[in-house]
Amino acid sequence: MMNEKALCTARELAIGYGKTPLLSDICLGVQPGQILTLIGPNGAGKSTLLRTLAGQLAPMGGTVLLAGKDLTAYTGTQRAQKLALMAPHSRRMELTTCFDFVSAGRYPYTGRLGILSAEDRQQVHRALELVGAVHLADRDFNRISDGQRQRILLARALCQQPEVILLDEPTSFLDIKGKIELLTILKELAHTGQLAVILSLHELELAEKIADTVVCVSPAGVSGVLTPEQAFQPENIRALY
């Protein structure tokens, strides 16, 4: 299910820390307008895989391609203009409005001084609009709900104007309403905005509803790219967990 249209591709990728790979022989790809969902037990390597695809960890083998080009050929700024990672955020931000927090996503465009142009401010407003959070712009980031915080984190990633967005457990700590709302936004962004999305999820029922394609990650290894029908067969889920 991988082809030349894939925006983010892993070829025979090996990932991990230290000298021994955690997982190897990983092959996957995601196209514009497509959502690829990673499922599997805790500690299997989903976060490590996402961080490697994002360029935060160096591969221990194999290749990551972004828009057909080796990820290592991009500068950090060039990579950030094409790919964004939304990871869990726990650090407290002192007296930071949601607008200012989202505007930090403009760093690939503002240069070292971080001065926002009119275009930058427009992109911040657009990102807040896309996630339904314009009304939070002037609120203190520390004083909003978990569901609102996830929307703001997503808006900051979208502010980079990426072609690919990676999300590590974006529904963690949300109630069921918050989970559904966030995944609905993601689905709209992918299918209407032609964004390529790779995300990890624990909730299998939600993963089955949102996924266009699925990759199963377990300590024993990583599957190829599967259809939801293949991935969520009862015997496959029993073997995975």
Walk through the language-model features, giving the residues of each:
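Conserved ABC transporter NBD signature motif
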Residues: 62-70
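Conserved catalytic motifs of ABC-family nucleotide-binding domains
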Residues: 161
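Conserved ABC ATPase "signature" region
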Residues: 103, 118-136
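Conserved ABC ATPase signature
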Residues: 115, 140-144, 148
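Catalytic Walker B motif of ABC-type/P-loop ATPase nucleotide-binding domains
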Residues: 165-168
